[in-house]
Amino acid sequence: MAKKRTSTIMGIDEAGRGPVIGPLVVCGIIVEEKDLPAIEAMGLKDSKKLSAKKREEFAAALKNKYKYELSVLPPQEIDARFESEDNLNRLEVNCFAGLIRSAKPTIAYLDACDVNAERFGINIKKCLDFELEIVSAHEADSKYPIVSAASIIAKVHRDSLIREISEKMGEDVGSGYPADPVTISFLKNYYMKHKCLPDCARKSWKTSNAVIADCLQARLFQFE
């Protein structure tokens, strides 16, 4: 008699969808169904609702006990995809599908980036050549602890990459998000000095264009 396949559950979420600096990080964590109660008992939340210290503690515990995979898209790859008219939703569909393809779970819980959560799941399923159940939902990181786990690992990994960027640049680049004045100040200062944006910036972003426009305007005023 054939041995029954063990049910495996996968949660997937991303960090760094909106920033103008740094990569997009997608994490998939996979556990056996019997491990779900332990994940739930950890009291995980959406990574954005946790302190940095708590995120790092949870991430260390999760990585030590469960299998996970990361997909990291640097700014250059994001920009190249946009030049070929791929949008961010399509990029994430490909990343999510790649992680699912590698792990081949029985069920995958996804934090949908598309405004239509059902469509996001359908588009991912079209990329796969095997059957599985997909649960695609908005704010899945607040609804499903397995997705909260993926969210935490993705966020902690991206934060570490942003710290590396600051170290490489020799100054604080901030969080990388457009609303962060430290990030915008860094980009403007860099552009004024080098007449270009750094490699860590997503040059296809509207924020990048706005930074360049502001710098060019400032130069015009200097010569008036």
From Swiss-Prot:
SUPFAM superfamilies recorded: Ribonuclease H-like (SSF53098)
Entries under Gene3D superfamilies matching the protein: Ribonuclease H-like superfamily/Ribonuclease H, Ribonuclease hii. Domain 2
GO biological process, one term: mismatch repair
Domain RNase H type-2: start-end pairs: 7-217
Keyword Transmembrane helix recorded: no
Catalytic reaction equation(s): Endonucleolytic cleavage to 5'-phosphomonoester
InterPro entries in the cross-refs: RNase_H2_suA (IPR004649), RNase_HII/HIII (IPR001352), RNase_HII/HIII_dom (IPR024567), RNase_HII_arc (IPR020787), RNase_HII_hlx-loop-hlx_cap_dom (IPR023160), RNaseH-like_sf (IPR012337), RNaseH_sf (IPR036397)
Alphabetical UniProt keywords: Cytoplasm, Endonuclease, Hydrolase, Manganese, Metal-binding, Nuclease
Cofactor(s) needed: Mn(2+); Mg(2+)
Keyword Cytoplasm among UniProt keywords: yes
Cellular component terms per the entry's GO annotation: cytoplasm; ribonuclease H2 complex
Co-factor note (free text): Manganese or magnesium. Binds 1 divalent metal ion per monomer in the absence of substrate. May bind a second metal ion after substrate binding.
Pfam families xrefs: RNase_HII
Residues at which a divalent metal cation binds: D13, E14, D111
EC numbers, comma separated: 3.1.26.4
Compartment list: Cytoplasm
Superkingdom classification of source: Archaea
GO molecular function, one term: RNA-DNA hybrid ribonuclease activity
Protein family membership: Belongs to the RNase HII family.
Function: Endonuclease that specifically degrades the RNA of RNA-DNA hybrids.
Protein name: Ribonuclease HII
UniProt source species: Methanocella arvoryzae (strain DSM 22066 / NBRC 105507 / MRE50)
